[in-house]
Amino acid sequence: MRAAVVTKDHKVSIEDKKLRALKPGEALVQTEYCGVCHTDLHVKNADFGDVTGVTLGHEGIGKVIEVAEDVESLKIGDRVSIAWMFESCGRCEYCTTGRETLCRSVKNAGYTVDGAMAEQVIVTADYAVKVPEKLDPAAASSITCAGVTTYKAVKVSNVKPGQWLGVFGIGGLGNLALQYAKNVMGAKIVAFDINDDKLAFAKELGADAIINSKDVDPVAEVMKLTDNKGLDATVVTSVAKTPFNQAVDVVKAGARVVAVGLPVDKMNLDIPRLVLDGIEVVGSLVGTRQDLREAFEFAAENKVTPKVQLRKLEEINDIFEEMEKGTITGRMVIKF
């Protein structure tokens, strides 16, 4: 079967791979779609360590074609996800308190184990979340990581209906954060970016205000918008240093800043302001299986509509080049 494999020179090679036989608790999935995430770019570039030889992909959707004898949670024909949180231990303090993404023994698809950019994938059956029948599978691929990540981040922000939430970076993650916050949580949205096309897209999605941080002072604009109060919360999907600092600068006292993007640079935080204004900066890592089920359901109810563009597996290196240039709006999804 064909698979997108990380090479030593930080490229991706389309190679033939042979899968082993299933072990107890596993299922074999025929991949239909796999979204391309910025984390895949980090993995390819060895930003988190050298994983030469691994098959990329953690936004996979496909149908079960085989199950091990002991599997009861899945059956042949089920449409399921292959997500970043591939498997956790199920026994530690995190797994037993609804925080399984923080498990110290967690396995991650497309990083520590082979992922979904392949024609077939072996999954741990209990961790393959079923996709609602009403949800388009190509759209579901985007929800599997980008969707659940931003849905969880918006939940972590504690934003309430009618409050102001700022979303920094309106790419594959940011556009979904905007939709979950607006259409599910009932928040008012300010979209921040330096790309006018992405900001126009944010306006189409229902953003109450858009701010090009390159052309104007985002702090001054927010103060005008909120009668000098500041935003109630921000979610940062950008991977650049400047927007993260701006996300702290635009919030009010007692607000929460949620970090989602994974910048390579170290951040500069104004600690005195955090202390004096009681501002919380928290990280939010993808989502649990329950978060993913909820994220899928909201998408199936058309409250969230991922913008996807279908591509071929052979185009994966081109997609990464476009990603590095910042020219992608929405999500690139590989169709198998």
From Swiss-Prot:
SUPFAM superfamilies in the cross-refs: GroES-like, NAD(P)-binding Rossmann-fold domains
EC number: 1.1.1.1
Single GO MF descriptor: alcohol dehydrogenase (NAD+) activity
PROSITE patterns (UniProt xref): ADH_ZINC
Enzyme class per UniProt: oxidoreductase
Needed co-factor(s): Zn(2+)
Record keywords: Metal-binding, NAD, Oxidoreductase, Zinc
Substrates-to-products reaction catalysed: a primary alcohol + NAD(+) = an aldehyde + NADH + H(+); a secondary alcohol + NAD(+) = a ketone + NADH + H(+)
Cofactor binding description: Binds 2 Zn(2+) ions per subunit.
Domain of life: Bacteria
Pfam families in the cross-refs: ADH_N, ADH_zinc_N
Binding site for Zn(2+) 1: C37, H58, C145
InterPro entries: ADH-like_C, ADH-like_N, ADH_Zn_CS, D-isomer_DH_CS1, GroES-like_sf, NAD(P)-bd_dom_sf, PKS_ER
Family: Belongs to the zinc-containing alcohol dehydrogenase family.
NCBIfam families: PRK09422.1
Protein name, entry field: Alcohol dehydrogenase
Species: Staphylococcus aureus (strain N315)
